[in-house]
Amino acid sequence: MRGCLQLARWLSAAPKGTAASLTRAPFGLANATRFFTNSAARAGSRATASKPVTDLENRISAIPIERYRNFCIVAHVDHGKSTLSDRLLELTGTIQPGSNKQVLDKLDVERERGITVKAQTCTMIYNHNGEDYLLHLVDTPGHVDFRAEVSRSYASCGGALLLVDASQGVQAQTVANFYLAFAQGLELIPVINKVDLPSAEPQRALDQMKHTFELDTENAVMVSAKTGLNVEQLLPTVVDKIPAPIGDCKKPLRMLLVDSWYDSYKGVICLVRIFDGELRAGQQVVSFATGLKYYVGEVGIMYPNETAQSVIRAGQVGYIYFNPGMKRSQEAKIGDTFTKVGSEKAVQPLPGFEEPKAMVFVAAYPVDADHFEHLEDSINQLVLNDRSITVQKESSEALGAGFRLGFLGTLHCSVFEDRLRQEHGASIIITPPSVPVKVIWTDGKEEIITSPVRFPDDEEVRNKIAEIQEPYVLATLTFPEEYLGKVIELCEANRGEQKTLEYFTATQVILKYELPLAQLVDDFFGKLKGSTKGYASLDYEESAWQPGHIVKLQLLVNKAPVDAVARIMHSSQVDRLARQWVTKFKQHVDRQLFEVVIQAAVGRKVIARETVKPYRKDVLAKLHASDVSRRRKLLEKQKEGRKRLRAVGNVVIEHKAFQAFLAK
């Protein structure tokens, strides 16, 4: 009774609101229960949708699509893309000038390494000749391993700033990224950066651009992104040279999913480009790829962080998330087209993106087997943000359950490993990178093998296999002419075949070599930098599959194979690696009561061997020095005992031994 009276007091003391005020939801409370699974979600949606229109939104809504400009910055690694992005954001008032450093490099690993890994986007408003322009900037990665990020970014853009370092000139990835942009039909604006450096040679860089790309460099802009010199000249050039996107707000919604990432509160957030129509919170959309339907919880722009808006229109790039969110991260398919429910027949889906192929594979295992599920969740969340990674579950007798991961290159793999450790606190064991091989059977069937576990044994190779092929790449190397001899020597030592050699200035060389991908992932870039004192740059593209003498090298401990360590490789690498393996593994295996034999073998042929000596009990301690027959008898007995122990004893190898052995 006392509880009922207390409840009545609370209810009577509650503020009284009119019933009418509850019906002012933007899309009608009668239908709200269809959109959201619970009352908390309904309340969240009303709060999102009923935000007052801001001054920023009023300015954006007044800009017609003819005054939109979508552009990106194309350059080699470390030529100043992210720094230039900062200056442009400051110039347009998007961020405050001063202490900003690589605002669009949002990952810890990007700030640590000083490279861009993920293409990041930002919307800016720029006033030119008294009129507002809506500029959409994409800061793209420069490294070859993130080519898929670059090509996806170009789908959102109408033009690009082709940025070249005044002191280094045109580099390998400048060439590669130029051809990607050129193939997409982007309008290119030449920009020379770092003109304030004492070693800067702007005219040489301009001549290289003119000779290599056949670009008109008369209107090239000379800037210093670090000091801000001449950066203000870039934006009028962007407005004048880059075309506006094509789109119609009155047509049915046609929206391309460009990227996605995971937020612990909002779930899957999607970066989208609107080609036609417009999108508001509360509307229902459908995916062409999966057929699944979603209610939009929030729409907005990156300014430079997520900034909610009431609507995003044709020509804009923005973010959305659904409420309720996507049930599985795999539902967000990059390159998918969305439209409003009911408009499916009126809308033609967009072509989407070419799926990048993983070319470098590693196995990943949790240090503690109990953390397998945590590792699986962490990998799935990162794959949501990077769809070029392939994931397959794998099991090892030595290391337990794990994953076989495929990457675009070794830097891609290294960055993913760093992100797993930093963003998710995952403790993992990673095996050395390997490349896929193609097995052609005698009956004509072809099979791509990415894991040593699936590689055929010796008998199958002899009797059932016609040929084994390995992937080759066409590598483009640029470097000063004085290192030509050393670079050719390095390429030849790595089974390379020279294709072209040309000088694009009196002192700079472009050398093209066809190289096995397996040699490229074996620290080829590090060796190249060492041979040229850091002056060389490298880019590569897929070439073809070529036949090779491919074998599987295994590590045996007391004749038992250690599956986690096996590698597929060319026979020319076997001797060197086999000796390295047995020497290194011996250092991490504890002594036992019996002899431990460590061998590296190809099939039945042992290539290298090391032995871990056993502990030895002094059985002669109590004997008199002259008792020779007794001495012999005790030693024979000890020898027999060891033989029996070796026959039945299993070598116990600690987890930390594998961790130390596989560590770089």
From Swiss-Prot:
BP terms from Gene Ontology: positive regulation of translation; translation
Keyword rRNA-binding annotated: no
Subcellular location: Mitochondrion inner membrane
Membrane topology term: Peripheral membrane protein
One GO molecular-function entry: GTP binding
Keywords: GTP-binding, Hydrolase, Membrane, Mitochondrion, Mitochondrion inner membrane, Nucleotide-binding, Protein biosynthesis, Transit peptide
Keyword Transport annotated: no
EC number: 3.6.5.-
Record GO cellular component, one term: mitochondrial matrix
Domain tr-type G span(s) in chain numbering: 66-246
Family: Belongs to the TRAFAC class translation factor GTPase superfamily. Classic translation factor GTPase family. LepA subfamily.
Function (record text): Promotes mitochondrial protein synthesis. May act as a fidelity factor of the translation reaction, by catalyzing a one-codon backward translocation of tRNAs on improperly translocated ribosomes. Binds to mitochondrial ribosomes in a GTP-dependent manner.
Protein's recorded name: Translation factor guf1, mitochondrial
Organism classification: Eukaryota, Fungi, Dikarya, Ascomycota, Pezizomycotina
Gene: guf1
